[in-house]
Amino acid sequence: IMKHRILALVLAGMLTAAATACGSTNSKTSKNADAKPTVAYKDMQVGETATDLKADLKILTNRTDLVDSDFQDYISEFNAMYPNITITYEGITDYDTDATTRLSSGDWGDICCIPTTVDKSELSNYFEKIGDYGDFKDTYEFADKQMFNNEVYGIPTMGNVSGVVYNKAVFEKAGITELPTDPETFLADLKLIQEKTDAIPLYTNYAAGWTLTAWDAYISGGATGDADFKNNKLVHSKDPFAKHDDMTGPFAVYDTLYEAVKQGLTEEDPTTTDWEGCKAQINEGNIGCMVLGSWAVPQMQAGGPNADDIA
């Protein structure tokens, strides 16, 4: 189902690119405000709409692990219906930084994962809207995440939950039989990994930068038990980052990272961490765990021969 939806989005981008020459200018904005897509997204039928259209499309993606595998299957399936469309995927490791720079210069392509650096109010400066929210809300979860003034500029390709990706074999070797449920136990388990294995207990991926934002996701429901905390209560709290006696709340999240580094439970030199390389390292048991999200699990499983060790 998701592949079908992604192909539909590519079709939308194809028609928009044909109508607006999206991404072909050198100005800050890569859209033609007067041009409109020839067919509305809600009216498109994959395999039926505009099958005779010719175009060349470049798609920027942060999923460097899929460029030469799954995405090639997407292209083949799409070309079976649209043989005159040439699609090229370009994977970018430091996605937010590089994609933002290229958006600003206008030299980026036709379709991309919208960088987190783009403010919602600026979406129309770089992208064509693909429809009104009403066209998507009953079909897609989180369709409002890249929306401004009820106009949708991007739809999600997946939904994730925050968490800790870990190597089960490393935890077992360290004698950890139950997963930690509080910061104190988590730090104690990292200490066990340090003492009883050769693995780096907690790998921060500091050098990549964007990976550290995974910690920010914890300050909401994960740290407070309140799903409304981050969006509705954080900004109205007098001292939201104060230390609580029960070690809940945002302070506990960032303090856990601070204590892990302070106690030497992370890599020796955080400036030399390697995002792509960490996938093989955790798969091979050289890393105990990383704070990321559910999206990272399959990438770490594909990093080596020990997929069953990753959870």
Predicted feature residues:
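Short, low-complexity disordered leader/linker segments with a strong preference
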Residues: I1-L57, A80, F136
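Short, well-ordered beta-strand elements
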Residues: V39-D43, D52-D65, I85-E90, I111, ...
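Short, solvent-exposed loop/beta-turn-alpha elements that line the ligand-binding surface or hinge
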Residues: K129-Y140, G222-A252, A302-P305
